[in-house]
Every structure is written in C-alpha cells, then in structure tokens.
C-alpha cells in the first residue's frame, strides 16, 4: 500500500501540490530517508540552515505513524526522568532532561512561523485510574518542575470530573504546555515548508539500497541520490531490507484508533469542556481527544509485532464506552491502525551507521514531540556541534530478549504482567 490509510486524518487532510517521484540521478548535501516527522523535522531544520536537502518517502508524506497517531503533544520521553537518572547517572539525566520539553516548543514555533493549519489546541491531561497512579503523577510533577516545566497543575477527583465527564479517574496532571493537533496536516505543512526553503521532497520513491561510500549513494527503483550525508528516518516503516542492523534493536508495535460520527456541540463540550487531550496512566494506555469538527477520537491497546487486528472496533469501542457510557449507540465513522517503534529501554535510539550515515528511531510512543527534537539535534551535529545528539547516541541500545523470533511473546508476557498490576492497583 502506498496511499494513506483510510483514516479520519486522510479524509480531512489539507490539499497540497503532490511531490514528484524520483526518476533521475541527483546530488545534494543531505539525503533523508523517510517522510515522517523524523525526516521532515531533520530536513526542515537543515534546509533552514542552508543545506541542500532531499527527502525520499516510499509512500506519501506522513504515511506511517506521523499521519496515524493520536495527535497528542506529550512532553518528555517514554522513560520517566527519575528512571533515566537511576539508569544512566545524573550527568546524562541533566543533559537529556534539559531537552525534554523542546519538541513541543519546536512544533508550536513551526505552526506559527509557517501558518500550518493543523487544529492545534493547548493542554494535555494525564489521568490516574487509582491512588497509586495519582501518587506517581505527583512525583512526575515534581520531577518535571526540576527540569523547568512550570506549567503543571495537579487535579483531584472533583477537579478532573470538571474536565472530563467520566467517573473512572481519581485525579490527573494537567500539562498546559501539552496539546493536540491533526498530525497528518502537520506533516503536510512541514513538507511544504521544506519546499519553501529550497529542499526537494519526493514521494513514491522507496529506497532500495544505501551505499556506504564517501559520498554516499542512495538508490530507488528509478533514480539515485549522491549525498555528503544520509539520515535514515524510516522508524517502524523502514523494514529490514535497508539497514537491517536497525531492525535488530527495535520492534514495531501496532495501535488502534477509532473516530466517532460528529457529535453535537453541546455533547462534545460536555465530554471535555476545555478541549484537552487525555491519556491514562496504565501500562497499555487509552488516549482520546475531540477533533476540530466535534468527533471523539479514541485509541488504545498495543499489538506487539505490528500485526493488524481483524476488527478494530471490537477492540476499541468497549474501551470508549467504559470511559463514556453516555455515548452508547454512537456511530463509528473511521477506524484504522498504525505502527510505532518500541525499544527495550523505551529511550530513542540515535547513532551512526557510518562516518556520514546517521539514524534516529524508536521513540516508543512519544514520537510526535521527540521526533521534532531529533531533527534539531541532527542539524546541530551536521553544523559541527554533536554534544546533544551524542547524549542520546551514547545510550546503550539493547536487543529484545528472544531475538526476532521470540521478542513478541516475551514482550507480550511482560505487558500482561504490568496490565494486571494496573487492574489491581498495585
């Protein structure tokens, strides 16, 4: 499949002048493999800095996770900062912590600078299902404040019921610097911004080989790019044919999303009066928000190994109705799946495949914001300052136990254990 999946996002995407397919031999400073957020953010930062940039996308801009996700701007990393402190030491934690709110700031700056129409709304809620989770949110607030986020507000059970019309929650952490967007329209807007800055973007141009030479040569079925530098940014949709070493360090995982029919203004505002996005604190979490046209977009669950379930509605609708029983009987207009890339450490993987070939992948569910940080860091590196990129590149990249064969059942067993703990509140 090369066209966008039949999602709400594809149905409501902004129109854009299509990008050509590469059918010739060209040269550039930097060739970026992948037209999702990692590739787009990298290319835009570099184009703004004066680099001659080429982006090669196998399908359409935002085809993968960047055009299918929940659209939530979630700060920080998938691994909490206190765990980072214990795992990697305070010096590394201070460096990583100093960057963990930059991704959202970059997105907001991009939206403003390029007038990207992507339905941005501020504010994100992390909701607690029990007292243990609420205590963890209190700790998270303290930890984030130590690293500079002063836009946090802890809500008790009464306060969260004023923000979300559900009786499931014992409290919440409101991050005023969070928010939500139409993710595919953000990707389209960023691709147009690359073009505006002189970059070249190609769709339907799947990379078949990266030749590790100086300069590097990136080949597609109908053309090739000779580049001083290459950035591999395919993430969960890269596959294992191009740079197979990357596939050994990560695992694609699927998540499922549905979108309701349009709700009345009164009903929509009764559910989430201030139009925040919401995610719970379970290991296998639910996440949801309202769209610009008053639909409820609801996602949840993980399929390890990225197998598409037979019936997305059967999996997700019960979750939606458990949260909002008042929506019983609501029609579901869209349902889809999408893959994200999981790492064993839950930290992003940055690094070098050769002296002039770089990669960034594995945001483990925090890709919307973290990809935009990644683009800034690779641009810094290619401009001569590798310090912040190397703060990530120096982290260990562990393979999943069991290798390619057993990593799925082993990880699923671990997830089942933590999900049971969530249900028991321990």
Curated annotation (Swiss-Prot):
Gene3D superfamilies: D-Amino Acid Oxidase, subunit A, domain 2, FAD/NAD(P)-binding domain. Its EC number is 1.4.3.-. It catalyses: gamma-L-glutamylputrescine + O2 + H2O = 4-(gamma-L-glutamylamino)butanal + H2O2 + NH4(+). InterPro entries: FAD-dep_OxRdtase (IPR006076), FAD/NAD-bd_sf (IPR036188). Pathway: Amine and polyamine degradation; putrescine degradation; 4-aminobutanoate from putrescine: step 2/4. GO terms for molecular function: oxidoreductase activity. GO terms for cellular component: cytoplasm. GO terms for biological process: putrescine catabolic process. Keywords: NAD, Oxidoreductase. Belongs to the gamma-glutamylputrescine oxidoreductase family. Involved in the breakdown of putrescine via the oxidation of L-glutamylputrescine. PANTHER family: GAMMA-GLUTAMYLPUTRESCINE OXIDOREDUCTASE (PTHR13847:SF275), SARCOSINE DEHYDROGENASE-RELATED (PTHR13847). This is Gamma-glutamylputrescine oxidoreductase. It comes from Escherichia coli (strain K12). The lineage of its organism: Bacteria, Pseudomonadati, Pseudomonadota, Gammaproteobacteria, Enterobacterales.
């Amino acid at each position: 499949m090369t066209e966008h999946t039949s999602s709400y996002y594809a149905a409501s995407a902004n129109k854009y002048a299509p990008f050509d397919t590469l059918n010739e031999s060209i040269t550039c400073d930097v060739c970026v493999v992948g037209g999702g957020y990692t590739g787009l953010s990298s290319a835009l930062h570099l184009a703004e800095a004066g680099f001659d940039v080429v982006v090669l996308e196998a399908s359409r801009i935002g085809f993968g996770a960047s055009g299918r996700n929940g659209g939530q701007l979630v700060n920080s990393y998938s691994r909490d900062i206190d765990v980072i402190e214990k795992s990697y030491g305070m010096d590394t934690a201070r460096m990583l912590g100093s960057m963990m709110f930059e991704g959202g700031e970059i997105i907001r700056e991009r939206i403003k600078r390029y007038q990207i129409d992507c339905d941005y709304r501020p504010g994100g809620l992390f909701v607690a299902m029990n007292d243990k989770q609420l205590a963890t949110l209190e700790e998270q607030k303290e930890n984030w404040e130590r690293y500079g986020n002063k836009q946090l507000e802890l809500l008790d059970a009464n306060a969260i019921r004023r923000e979300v019309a559900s009786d499931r929650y014992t409290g919440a952490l409101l991050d005023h610097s969070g928010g939500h967007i139409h993710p595919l329209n953000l990707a389209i807007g960023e691709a147009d911004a690359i073009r505006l800055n002189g970059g070249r973007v190609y769709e339907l141009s799947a990379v078949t080989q990266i030749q590790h030479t100086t300069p590097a040569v990136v080949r597609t079925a109908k053309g090739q790019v000779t580049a001083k530098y290459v950035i591999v940014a395919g993430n969960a949709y890269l596959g294992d044919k191009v740079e197979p070493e990357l596939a050994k360090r990560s695992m694609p995982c699927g998540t499922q999303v549905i979108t309701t029919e349009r709700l009345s203004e009164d009903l929509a505002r009764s559910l989430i009066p201030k139009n925040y996005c919401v995610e719970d604190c379970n290991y296998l979490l639910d996440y949801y928000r309202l769209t610009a046209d008053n639909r409820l977009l609801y996602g949840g669950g993980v399929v390890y190994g990225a197998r598409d379930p037979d019936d997305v509605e059967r999996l997700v609708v019960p979750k939606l109705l458990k949260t909002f029983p008042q929506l019983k009987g609501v029609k579901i207009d869209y349902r889809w799946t999408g893959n994200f890339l999981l790492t064993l450490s839950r930290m992003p993987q940055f690094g070098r495949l050769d002296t002039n070939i770089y990669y960034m992948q594995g945001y483990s569910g925090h890709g919307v914001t973290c990809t935009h940080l990644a683009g800034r860091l690779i641009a810094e590196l290619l401009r001569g300052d590798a310090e912040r990129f190397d703060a990530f590149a120096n982290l260990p990249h562990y393979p999943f136990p069991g290798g390619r064969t057993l990593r799925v059942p082993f990880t699923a067993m671990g997830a089942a254990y933590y999900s049971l703990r969530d249900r028991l509140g321990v």
